[in-house]
Amino acid sequence: MADGGKPPTPEKKSWADVEEEEEAKAKAAAAAEAASSSSSNEPAVDAQAKQIEALSLSVPEEHGGSGGGGDDQGPPLLDDSDESQIQAVTSGGTVYESAAAFEDLKLTPELLKGLHDEMGFSRPSKIQAVTLPMILTPPYKDLIAQAHNGSGKTTCFVLGMLSRVDPNRKVTQAICICPTRELAQQNKSVLMRMGKFTGITCACAIPPAQKDYVPIAKMPKITDQVVIGTSGTLMKWINHKKILTNDIKILVFDEADHMLAEDGFRSDSERIMRDIQRSAGGCQVLLFSATFNERVKDFVTRVIKDGNQIFVKKEELTLEKVKQYKVQVPDERAKIAVIKDKIFEFGQKVGQVIIFVRTKQSTKDVHNALTLEDYVCSSIQGSLDQSEREKIIQEFKNGYTKVLISTDVLARGFDQAQVNLVINYDMPIKFGTRDEPDYEVYLHRIGRAGRFGRKGAVFNLLCGETDNTVMRKIETYFQHNVPEVRNWQSEEDFERALKDAGLVE
């Protein structure tokens, strides 16, 4: 496809923004089909894989959470419960031993220095102890890995990429595909910190801001050893030969459930995978996510026919460290009243807040309603210019704003240790349905609170029978009863809820 000299028109929609009613009609049929599929999270095992041996991997007791590095109060702890049951399925005859220390993985001194000094990690988390040997032990097998938010998944694939590439070769050897620009930038930041002493460089393949636009024909070829980006931009760079794929050793899909879902980015993801596998031969493929529904699992296990698998049991995917509540309100105005008069009265004392809404218009409405009451807040959704999104994210991360209103553009992978409260202003539902919950999105949303094992609280604001139906289905699916704040007008009830969550004395 020829590249013109005009700057690209900003995308009208993002995967994370629910289309307004007239925009959604074209997707309704496909979405309804997706909604009718099973959403079980039980591990999918290929019945024909007779050589696969199921292992019950035990991790030594000293495997506490590793440091998360980064804030003034010391390294945050990972969500690394002693009760976590990791179900592993290995392919072939390789025997993997869990790693009690990063030194057990035969990493370079430069990588160990980055892990300990720059990242503040002391030892592998439970998921890292099991997963990293599978990634780093020859022969290099593909891997499907599901683990809960905050368990250390990012370190697994970032360390995998840094370990596999040769810093002396100025060619791209590792690619990581992400669903959003923000997640791509965040993963690059982690890689650059962890690999600070290795000399490895990383390019970020995301749609440029208007002011930074350069016609792709004029772009130089990418010589960074690692490229992290969104699927659309990566496809353009590969198609225009800005990235040469014949030296790729490792291909990572972060939030793989969405990257390979039919209503996500499956088309681009499959094309990138085919192109790399065709040109690079035995490229190792790593698929990481907190959730995999049954349809995605079925697709993935057909694509990855001879790989290892790691799954956390379904009942552990409820994020017990995050206290969830439901709040019955009579109307939309009452939702705003609850936020500003009840939750904010205590929420501002304990940390930052993310309010999740369903549509771009709702983002504006909630933002306007709160600013009219003199609350300082910011809002983000997919149609904003890239520079605007970056500015808003950075201001929130720096603590300049305490309240962020967002569509699901931030539901996945956004790490901000100071976020203690999440408010579901709108419950997440699947495209084209009235009351079918999007279980994966719900899990990812509540995972924004209490990152790295810290405590957090989630308030689900329910208005009418539809919201209550969605909430009941979520409780049934995750086998978790969400307690109710008895009176939406009672300050005492909200204060008691936050005390129970461990957020106020």
Curated annotation (Swiss-Prot):
Residue positions binding ATP: 147-154
Record keywords, A-Z: ATP-binding, Cytoplasm, Helicase, Hydrolase, mRNA transport, Nucleotide-binding, Nucleus, RNA-binding, Transport
SUPFAM superfamilies: P-loop containing nucleoside triphosphate hydrolases
Locus of motif Q motif: 100-129
Keyword Hydrolase on entry: yes
Motif (DEAD box): 254-257
Domain Helicase ATP-binding as annotated: residue spans: 134-310
Top-level taxon: Eukaryota
Biased composition (Low complexity): 27-44
Pfam short name (any one): DEAD
GO molecular function, one term: ATP binding
Catalysed reactions, semicolon-separated: ATP + H2O = ADP + phosphate + H(+)
Subcellular location: Cytoplasm; Nucleus
GO cellular component terms given for this protein: cytoplasmic stress granule; nuclear envelope; nucleus
Ranges for region Disordered: 1-81
Helicase C-terminal domain ranges (all copies): 338-493
EC number, UniProt record: 3.6.4.13
GO process annotations (BP): poly(A)+ mRNA export from nucleus; response to abscisic acid; response to cold; response to heat
Family: Belongs to the DEAD box helicase family. DDX19/DBP5 subfamily.
Function: ATP-dependent RNA helicase essential for mRNA export from the nucleus. Plays an important role in the positive regulation of CBF/DREB transcription factors.
Annotated domain remarks: The Q motif is unique to and characteristic of the DEAD box family of RNA helicases and controls ATP binding and hydrolysis.
The name this protein goes by in its record: DEAD-box ATP-dependent RNA helicase 38
Species whose genome carries this gene: Oryza sativa subsp. japonica (Rice)
